[in-house]
From Swiss-Prot:
It comes from Shewanella woodyi (strain ATCC 51908 / MS32). Pfam families: SurE. This is 5'-nucleotidase SurE. Keywords: Cytoplasm, Hydrolase, Metal-binding, Nucleotide-binding. The gene is surE. It is found in: Cytoplasm.
Length: 249
């Protein structure tokens, strides 16, 4: 049976990872390994100065005292006797579109799977009330089936964003590029009970590039967005001009 590793960044007991695991368990051999707390915004961070501890929960899920990347790395390197066939990260509670992908622990967990040579998917549910995890699970299952039948290039992951709608109201699937946000709002400053300044990150910026063809545009218009993301961040179209710039120094 096909083996799928499921992870996330919202924590191993979050509703999204439960919905995803339940949807896949009837067709695949699923191992669910996630962080023991919410690690949203953890990106590709690793735990380097503390040991990782694991705990198997009553439902069989494995809780890890680390980041999403730690979870995937530990599962593949230690918990599996034979490697899984695929890594699926999610279902995230909220969008991972545009610039979000740089900060996302959900995307990072999928990236770690790809770093270790496995096909990988990150999936997020986009909306304010987040009622329809079943819709995200439905489309994820459909895309997994397609990937197993016809794999994509090995240097990429698929970043999926699903509008928070019933399945029958979703118009279809669109392949997209990343959009972009305006810069985030300023820090929120307040004081603790002792009168010392404390700070909270402000809300993310509003959509800046949500034009047709972007993930923002697709989801806003009722479509599932599938964006292929590459691991290599090199700006290849700038290599020649950068050489010319360096030569002038």
């Amino acid at each position: 049976m096909i083996k799928i590793l499921v992870s996330n960044d919202d924590g191993v007991t979050a509703p999204g990872i439960v919905a995803l695991t339940n949807a896949l368990a009837s067709s695949y051999d699923v191992m669910t390994v996630g962080p023991d707390r919410n690690c949203s915004g953890a990106s590709n961070s690793l735990t380097l100065t503390n040991p990782l501890r694991i705990n198997t929960l009553s439902n069989g899920y494995v809780s890890v005292s680390g980041t999403p990347t730690d979870c995937v790395h530990l599962a593949i390197r230690e918990l599996y006797t034979d490697e899984p066939d695929m890594v699926v990260s999610g279902i995230n509670a909220g969008a991972n579109m545009g610039d979000d992908t740089l900060y996302s622990g959900t995307v990072a967990a999928a990236m770690e799977g790809r770093f270790l040579g496995l096909p990988a998917i990150a999936v997020s549910l986009v909306g304010s009330k987040l009622k329809h995890y079943d819709s995200a699970a439905f489309f994820t299952s459909k895309i997994i089936k397609g990937l197993l039948e016809s794999p994509v290039a090995q240097d990429q992951i698929l970043n999926i964003n699903v509008p928070d709608l019933p399945v029958e109201q979703i118009k279809g699937i669109k392949v997209t590029r990343l959009g972009a946000r305006h810069k985030a709002a300023g820090m929120l400053k307040t004081q603790d009970p002792a009168g010392r300044d404390i700070f909270w990150l402000g809300p993310p910026g509003e959509e800046q590039d949500a034009s047709e063809g972007t993930d923002f545009h697709a989801v806003t218009n009722g479509y599932v967005s599938v964006t292929p993301l590459t691991v290599d961040l090199t700006a290849f179209n700038q290599i020649t001009s950068m050489k010319e710039w360096i030569d002038k120094l």
